[in-house]
UniProtKB/Swiss-Prot annotation:
Residues 10-183 form the PCI domain. Component of the COP9 signalosome complex (CSN), a complex involved in various cellular and developmental processes. The CSN complex is an essential regulator of the ubiquitin (Ubl) conjugation pathway by mediating the deneddylation of the cullin subunits of E3 ligase complexes, leading to modify the Ubl ligase activity. This is COP9 signalosome complex subunit 8. GO terms for cellular component: COP9 signalosome; cytoplasm. It is found in: Cytoplasm; Nucleus. Its main location: cytoplasm. Pfam families: CSN8_PSD8_EIF3K. The keyword Cytoplasm applies. It comes from the Eukaryota.
Amino acid sequence: MKLSESVMAQNSVSFQKLQEQCEEQELEAPGGIASPQVYNQLLALYLLHNDLNNARYLWKRIPSAIKSSHSELGGIWEVGQKIWQRDFPGIYTSISAYQWSENIQQIMEAVRDATQQRAFGLVSQAYTSISADDFAAFVGLPVEEAVKGVLEQGWQADSATGMVMPKKPDSAPLSLIPNEQQLARLTDYVAFLEN
């Protein structure tokens, strides 16, 4: 189920605020150890924003007693490891295999949706054609639903061959810098290095 663009934008803002609050709570926690709920949310939010470095450092900071006593935290980290390994089918399997608590459920659904969007984008950039089965595994959807999704995106699907032909993304126009501006930048850079 795809979220509309406006709902996703609203959720993005609220998730960003929640991440800032969790980071603040972690910093202000007595003894430097936050609650497991803060760690759960913060780790999931880092994964949502594809901030894998902060997710890894957070995982290293979390005391091992909290890691071992809260299995949900391990489940979130398992999803993070799959993201790190770019194991897209594994990401979806890990997300759906766990019964998330109420305060994490919405974030993990957003992680799944963001991963699907990222997969759509990667396929559109990297492939001229891909089998519908491989594509469905890559985006974590049943084959019929994946083919329906590509047709909505303006892609082509051939039912006879079972292939999906992605539509190449519109490339952003390159802004050409006039030669004078480029020369001025180089001059400033060289002058900075000499001084």
